[in-house]
C-alpha cells in the first residue's frame, strides 16, 4: 500500500512538473516572439505601402523586387568614389551593416545642422511645440521641445502662471521623434527609390536664416547667388540698394535636388501628431498644401517605365509645397517612406500652474507614458505562470496529505 501511494505521488508530481515546464516554455516563446526584429525575416508585403526600408544589403534575402508582376522595394545603391561613409549618432533606428552606410562623411556637418534644427532644446529655433487654449484652440504663446518619459517639460515657457491647455505633450514628442528619424533616412545614400525629382514650382530657396531649413528636401550640387531684399514684404529681388540692403543667398539652381516621398497612411498620422508643432511659424499640418490640389506630374506610365522598368496602375502621388516656398515633399502609394508611428489620440485638457502640468479632474501631475501598458502586460504574464506553479504545488500537497 505504501509503495502504491509513493508511485501515485510520483506520477502526480511529474504531471505537475510537466505542466509547469510547458507553461514556462510557452512564456519564453511569447517573450521571444515579441522581441524578434522585423529585420531578421520578412514576408513579401501584400500592400505596397508596407514596404520595409533598410540600409543597403541588410537582408540576405534578395527577393524584394519585381515578382509575379507585383512591385516591391529594392534598394538602388551606388558607391561614390573616394567617399567615406559614417553612421550618425542620432540614428539608432537604422543599421550600419555594410561599408556603404546610410550617410556620407562629407554630409556630416550639414546633417548635424539639420538634426539640431529639430532636436535642439533651444526655443529660438523654428521647430517648437506650441501651447493651445483648451476652449478656443488659439495659440497661447510660449511652448516646449523636450518631453521626458514622466511627462515633465523642463524647457517649458509660458506667458501666464496658470493656463488651461490642450495636453499635446505626447503628440509633440512623437512628432519631433518622427521628424528626427525621417532625417536619418533622408540622409541615406541607399534609399534612392523613395526620392523624387525636383518640382519646377519651387523656384528658389532663401538661405540667409539658419533657423529656416527645409525638413524634407535633399540638397545636391547647387550654386548660391547673392540677392538684396528691397521689398516691404521680404520678397527677394536682385540688384543693389533698397530699404535695408539685407543680403540673402539663394540656391539659384536647385533643380538637381531631390524630395522625399511619404506613404499616404504614414503622412496622415504624422500630420495629426504634428498639428501641435510649429515649423517656421506655422503648424506643420498647415505649412504644406498640395500643389493645385492635383496629383504630381509623375503619375504617367511612361515615367514609371523609364525609372523603375514597370507599369504601375492607379499610381496616386501628390506634391506638397510649403507656403514659404522653402520645402516640398511627395505623398505617394509607391516606393515611399514609412516607419512605425503610434495612432493619434485626441488629447485631453490639462492645467499648467507655475510651469507644472496637472490633470484637470484630479489636480494630479501624473503622466502615463507609453511604456506603462507594456510593463503591465509583462507583469501579468509572469504572475500568470507563478500562479500556475503555486496551484500545482498546492494540489500535490493536498493529495499527499490525503493519501
From Swiss-Prot:
Coiled coil: none annotated. It is found in: Membrane. Keywords: Glycoprotein, Membrane, Signal, Transmembrane, Transmembrane helix. The chain crosses the membrane at residues 382-402. It is a single-pass type I membrane protein. Residues 403 are cytoplasmic. Residues 27-381 are extracellular. GO terms for cellular component: membrane. Residues 1-26 form the signal peptide. Glycans are attached at residues 58, 90, 93, 124, 137, 371, 375. It comes from the Eukaryota. The keyword Signal applies. This is Putative uncharacterized transmembrane protein DDB_G0288627. It comes from Dictyostelium discoideum.
Amino acid at each position: 500500500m505504501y509503495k502504491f501511494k509513493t508511485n501515485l505521488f510520483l506520477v502526480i508530481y511529474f504531471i505537475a512538473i510537466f505542466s509547469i515546464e510547458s507553461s514556462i516554455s510557452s512564456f519564453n516563446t511569447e517573450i521571444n516572439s515579441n522581441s524578434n526584429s522585423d529585420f531578421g525575416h520578412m514576408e513579401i508585403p501584400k500592400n505596397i505601402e508596407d514596404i520595409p526600408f533598410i540600409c543597403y544589403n541588410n537582408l540576405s534575402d534578395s527577393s524584394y523586387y519585381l515578382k509575379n508582376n507585383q512591385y516591391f522595394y529594392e534598394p538602388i545603391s551606388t558607391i561614390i568614389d573616394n567617399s567615406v561613409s559614417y553612421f550618425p549618432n542620432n540614428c539608432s533606428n537604422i543599421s550600419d551593416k555594410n561599408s556603404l552606410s546610410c550617410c556620407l562623411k562629407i554630409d556630416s556637418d550639414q546633417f548635424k545642422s539639420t538634426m539640431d534644427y529639430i532636436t535642439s532644446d533651444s526655443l529660438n529655433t523654428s521647430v517648437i511645440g506650441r501651447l493651445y487654449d483648451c476652449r478656443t484652440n488659439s495659440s497661447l504663446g510660449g511652448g516646449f521641445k523636450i518631453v521626458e518619459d514622466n511627462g515633465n517639460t523642463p524647457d517649458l515657457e509660458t506667458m501666464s502662471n496658470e493656463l488651461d491647455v490642450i495636453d499635446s505633450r505626447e503628440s509633440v514628442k512623437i512628432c519631433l521623434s518622427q521628424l528626427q528619424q525621417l532625417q536619418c533616412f533622408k540622409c541615406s545614400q541607399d534609399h534612392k527609390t523613395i526620392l523624387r525629382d525636383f518640382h519646377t514650382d519651387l523656384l528658389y530657396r532663401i538661405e540667409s536664416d539658419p533657423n529656416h531649413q527645409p525638413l524634407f528636401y535633399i540638397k545636391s550640387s547647387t550654386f548660391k547667388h547673392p540677392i538684396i531684399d528691397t521689398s516691404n514684404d521680404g520678397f527677394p529681388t536682385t540688384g543693389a540698394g533698397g530699404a535695408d540692403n539685407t543680403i540673402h543667398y539663394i540656391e539659384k539652381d536647385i533643380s538637381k535636388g531631390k524630395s522625399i516621398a511619404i506613404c499616404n497612411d504614414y503622412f496622415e498620422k504624422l500630420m495629426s501628431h504634428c498639428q501641435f508643432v510649429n515649423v517656421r511659424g506655422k503648424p506643420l499640418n498647415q505649412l504644406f498644401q498640395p500643389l493645385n490640389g492635383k496629383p504630381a506630374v509623375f503619375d504617367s506610365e511612361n515615367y514609371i517605365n523609364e525609372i523603375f522598368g514597370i507599369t504601375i496602375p492607379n499610381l496616386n502621388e501628390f506634391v506638397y509645397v510649403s507656403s514659404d516656398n522653402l520645402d516640398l515633399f511627395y505623398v505617394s502609394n509607391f516606393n515611399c517612406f514609412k516607419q512605425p508611428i503610434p495612432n493619434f489620440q485626441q488629447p485631453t485638457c490639462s492645467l499648467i500652474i507655475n510651469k507644472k502640468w496637472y490633470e484637470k479632474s484630479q489636480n494630479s501631475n501624473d503622466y502615463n507614458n507609453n511604456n506603462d501598458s507594456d510593463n503591465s502586460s509583462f507583469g501579468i504574464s509572469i504572475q500568470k505562470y507563478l500562479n500556475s506553479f503555486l496551484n500545482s504545488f498546492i494540489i500535490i500537497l493536498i493529495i499527499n496529505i490525503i493519501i
